[in-house]
């Protein structure tokens, strides 16, 4: 995104297409993490290969691990055989020692560290790793890819992806290993967590299954003229028969492109950063890019059923413009007080007041020269960035607080180089990071 000034802000990501469920990130960023520290800066030399022991997935346990990383399948190198189509899950302790296991490739899949343990999945299995070992759960319906994971206070884990009929699918995994699967066909839109449930925002053009119920609900609510298209908040899990439950409805707004529902509800209120297109008609005719517009907040109050659109303005009171290269796709977001704080995939950090829409550009994280951008995670206090030095296959974890103080290097290590890059006469490929997660309560000495 970029304020209405001469100085552009870099965010080379895309918001999902209006017809897509959630924006896909295409080629993920390269990098992986290895050791951790007890001081603000730790430089560890390249660990021997024995520092990481390879095990079967069902033999993993958390032990002293503080960091978990999921590596993608190998990326192709011209003139060499096809790279391996699998993923690595790596667990590392504060000294760079750890465990690694190979599982089947599942594009877009995340590792998620919860109070229950570490959650990750393959196309046909789900895993939960704890201090006692790994629970391996068979998945009845095979997954081709994954979009997001969510954790509930009662220990349940929800996995979101695409359904068999180009719709939305959610698997809810109970602590005893039971899996409840919900599929909503022909439905798209941003999806997120709201209390004990998974909800989404869609409309009657993007979801045929809600069409009749949505128009009926709007007619009962308004009593006025019927719009051509009705927007709705729906509950994805626990549907009402074959139709998702409607939580709120409102007239659809032409050219309103939802972003990423990356922050849970605040009570009964859902706030979603979105884009209002400059010229929806020109977008439909192919003359304008669908991401050209301004940033707004779409705010739904489920207790009243009302929707409000709040313009997002920079510190000079000007709209924040979006385009193909500067938008909301893939941002990492967290709520801190009355603000959404987020970092783009190029390291630009912002704060937006969820009530007024006033925005602040906090900082831009300087990045070393790498083949691909860093991978980010956010906490209430700041941003963690994971970067790889392409020449040396060295990995760096850094931290920058939201309130300033500059970028702090937390660790640098080469212990994972053999998992990142394979170079020999018969095979050459590079892996990228699908995701990484820090153990709850561990900050690497950042505070």
Language model features with spans:
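C-terminal hydrophobic structural anchor segments
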Residues: 372-396
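Surface-exposed loop/turn elements that mediate protein-protein interactions on large endomembrane-trafficking
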Residues: 48, 78-106, 122-144, 163-186, ...
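A detector of low-complexity, intrinsically disordered, Ser/Thr/Gly/Pro/Ala-rich segments
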Residues: 3, 11, 20, 149, ...
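Repeated scaffold domains used in trafficking and secretory/extracellular systems
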Residues: 53-58, 104-116, 142-154, 184-197, ...
